Amino acid sequence: MAASTDVAGLEESFRKFAIHGDPKASGHEMNGKNWAKLCKDCKVADGKAVTGTDVDIVFSKVKAKSARVINYEEFKKALEELAPKRFKGKSKEEAFDAICQLVAGKEPANVGVTKAKTGGAVERLTDTSKYTGSHKERFDESGKGKGIAGRQDILDDSGYVSAYKNAGTYDAKVKK
């Protein structure tokens, strides 16, 4: 079996992948999407010996019938199921150790996260200081949006005509 340091690293990886993408997750249970991500990111699923379909089938095998998630023990069982398929020609124990080393200490990769483009054709579209017309009024000098105040003209339903300058002075005139 794997050494105690590998087991600690394996459990840490399980927790990191279990909470990935779900702010409410406790880290004790992993769903199928995160299991597939773990297998892909840690190169357990290589596309040849172990495919995405194999990963999904193993997940379905190890979880309880009505459950949608697996715990750490079921996670280790799933790795044991995939190990001989991933490392053909090795014994079950050697294959499990090898697959544990692939997973241990890894964390989810944020592949596909993009940054805002600056320059070229998109510069005038993303720089709020270059906006014209009514769109210019939607942002303050720093480029932060003003919210609803920038999108709508708020009506004054006080009863006065819009250009009237002495609104609210009638009571002062009558009392004198």
Swiss-Prot record:
Sites of the modification N-acetylalanine?
2
Q: Which InterPro entries match?
A: EF-hand-dom_pair (IPR011992), TPP/p25 (IPR008907)
Q: Which Pfam families match?
A: p25-alpha (PF05517)
Q: Which domain of life is it from?
A: Eukaryota
Q: Where in the cell?
A: Cytoplasm; Cytoplasm, Cytoskeleton
- List, in alphabetical order, the GO biological process terms annotated in this UniProt record: decidualization; embryo implantation; microtubule bundle formation; microtubule polymerization; positive regulation of protein polymerization
| Signal peptide residue numbers | none
Alphabetically, the GO molecular function entries are: tubulin binding
Q: What is its main location?
A: cytoplasm
Q: Which family does it belong to?
A: Belongs to the TPPP family.
Query: In UniProt terms, what function does this protein have?
Result: Regulator of microtubule dynamic that has microtubule bundling activity. Required for embryo implantation; possibly by regulating beta-catenin. Also required for decidualization via regulation of beta-catenin.
Q: What is this protein called?
A: Tubulin polymerization-promoting protein family member 3
Tell me which species this is from.
Bos taurus
Lineage, opening ranks: Eukaryota, Metazoa, Chordata, Craniata, Vertebrata
Q: Per UniProt, what is the name of the gene that codes for the protein in this document?
A: TPPP3
